[in-house]
Amino acid sequence: MERNGGHYTDKTRVLDIKPLRTLRPVFPSGNQAPPFVCAPPFGPFPPGFSSFYPFSSSQANQHTPDLNQAQYPPQHQQPQNPPPVYQQQPPQHASEPSLVTPLRSFRSPDVSNGNAELEGSTVKRRIPKKRPISRPENMNFESGINVADRENGNRELVLSVLMRFDALRRRFAQLEDAKEAVSGIIKRPDLKSGSTCMGRGVRTNTKKRPGIVPGVEIGDVFFFRFEMCLVGLHSPSMAGIDYLVVKGETEEEPIATSIVSSGYYDNDEGNPDVLIYTGQGGNADKDKQSSDQKLERGNLALEKSLRRDSAVRVIRGLKEASHNAKIYIYDGLYEIKESWVEKGKSGHNTFKYKLVRAPGQPPAFASWTAIQKWKTGVPSRQGLILPDMTSGVESIPVSLVNEVDTDNGPAYFTYSTTVKYSESFKLMQPSFGCDCANLCKPGNLDCHCIRKNGGDFPYTGNGILVSRKPMIYECSPSCPCSTCKNKVTQMGVKVRLEVFKTANRGWGLRSWDAIRAGSFICIYVGEAKDKSKVQQTMANDDYTFDTTNVYNPFKWNYEPGLADEDACEEMSEESEIPLPLIISAKNVGNVARFMNHSCSPNVFWQPVSYENNSQLFVHVAFFAISHIPPMTELTYDYGVSRPSGTQNGNPLYGKRKCFCGSAYCRGSFG
């Protein structure tokens, strides 16, 4: 008991208070009782009802905080002598909703069954039917990334996170393709894969920082915005400006960490090392300004970075012609030199920032702009020997270039697109193909070709390989599905390749185009040989592919646990070929003969079988392990011969010295 102003209060009665969510409403008795009303916290409300604290403030001042991004910086007073960009007073942040889509919005909400119209309310709600949802948290899944590595990454970890994300994305795309198309539903397996990786800790560089990001290199390419988020290069999944709040002289203030120049605004500049960047906001859609931009959030952060001389990471967004999508190239650090306000094409004020690339960095965007000029022929490629060494055999030209010495080209060979098999190398008996009309539909188990692939279509809708398998079975030319997408390796080269002279490894192969992980590059063309008959001549043949070699194992497929699948369903990634296959491209071959060995390759080989001239043969197809930037040499692991044994404790010791220069170089191959 406690005395208070002459009265006694029994405090034990106060301690028995229950949370509001445990109380049940008490309805008045009688037929004239008013109906029970349920209305949104911001209204509208029926007559006689009003909101209660904390929802009593105006709706305009309410917004959902973005838990994945830094909160809006506090308002700063306008200085007495502002620069041109400060000519407008910044409005209150609360009146402008966040442009960044929270990652939690990609998860499906837990809803009730059926439809309901609330009696006595002016608001009608349609409650969708309950459906199973995937939880991003899985107590049984271990990401394998500790807290320290999650905050600060390295090159190996960055590549691992990107590979795991894309493997999961390809699996989700495969599952979506197998479903019936629903009108108005846009399939975004990248968002689903990204939110899953975020929720389960498959990410790195979560500690936001300006400047260099550990493990991310200049020239790295990304095909999805979520990839940049997972490796800490650029956190927002939609906004073009990323920033963090730091302590200023008198108060906290935002500084920009990175920007994405998506090309939606007038950002083009003749000099590839200079970027005129348009601020964010004021746009109803991506093509047209609808109102004046405001000095807040990212725009304010860029202005503060200008005053602090703080470098900003720049990611260039480019159009990918082959898939009608965007590709992003990390172009390094830029310094903000000046800012101003000008009228845009739509007549509204926009903030402009001039950024200049820091000197001493390797080229990235500049190389891409040079490649676009090479494709037009003006100017011509420096060191060009032949514009098309295939003489039109390939649908896309393959250039021959030497910028190293005076060598005019490799030794003569016949260019071909098909493997030459003798009668003794028909590896399998022909089988009946499918009877699908026009194309094989993913998920159709009546298709003979899909059944041979284990019930799953081996490629996504845009021709990307989903998983490595012991063998992939493609539809043959004799199948009636003329427009089938299960003929990826039979369609020839689809990227602009270049054979070039290397500094210390002879001729090599690279691409003018960025190559997406899982993309088909080419098959290995040559003459099939009997290993027992060519054992002696193989030592003098630098253009031999041997499927019997021993290769370093590596993990490329998706993780069933990350996809909420049974781990026992994980398929083998080891190739299985019925008979030893050796292909010599010394006299007859294609561009594959110029791919050099690397102990850390960016390309892998996959056995593919399809019928040709009423006989089934195995072909060696090459696919990209990861995203490959333009002008990066394409390499694969040659492996070592099985009888080589061990040397210096290394079971993979080959006959030839390796010059790949990789940090994981084993010193030899072949």
UniProtKB/Swiss-Prot annotation:
Composition-biased stretches (Basic residues): 123-133
Residues given in the record as Zn(2+) 1 binding sites: C434, C436, C440, C447
Domain YDG, residue spans: 211-357
Binding site residues for Zn(2+) 2: C434, C449, C475, C479
GO cellular component: chromosome, centromeric region; nucleus
Cellular localisation: Nucleus; Chromosome, Centromere
Domain Post-SET: 654-670
Enzyme Commission designation: 2.1.1.368
Alphabetically ordered keywords of this record: Centromere, Chromatin regulator, Chromosome, Metal-binding, Methyltransferase, Nucleus, S-adenosyl-L-methionine, Transferase, Zinc
Residue span(s) of domain Pre-SET: 432-492
Entries under PROSITE patterns matching the protein: POST_SET, PRE_SET, SAM_MT43_SUVAR39_2, SET, YDG
GO biological process: epigenetic regulation of gene expression; methylation
Biased composition (Low complexity): 68-79
Tissue expression remark: Expressed in leaves stems and flowers.
Domain topic, free-text comment: Although the SET domain contains the active site of enzymatic activity, both pre-SET and post-SET domains are required for methyltransferase activity.
Name of the protein described by the UniProt record: Histone-lysine N-methyltransferase, H3 lysine-9 specific SUVH1
Organism of derivation: Arabidopsis thaliana
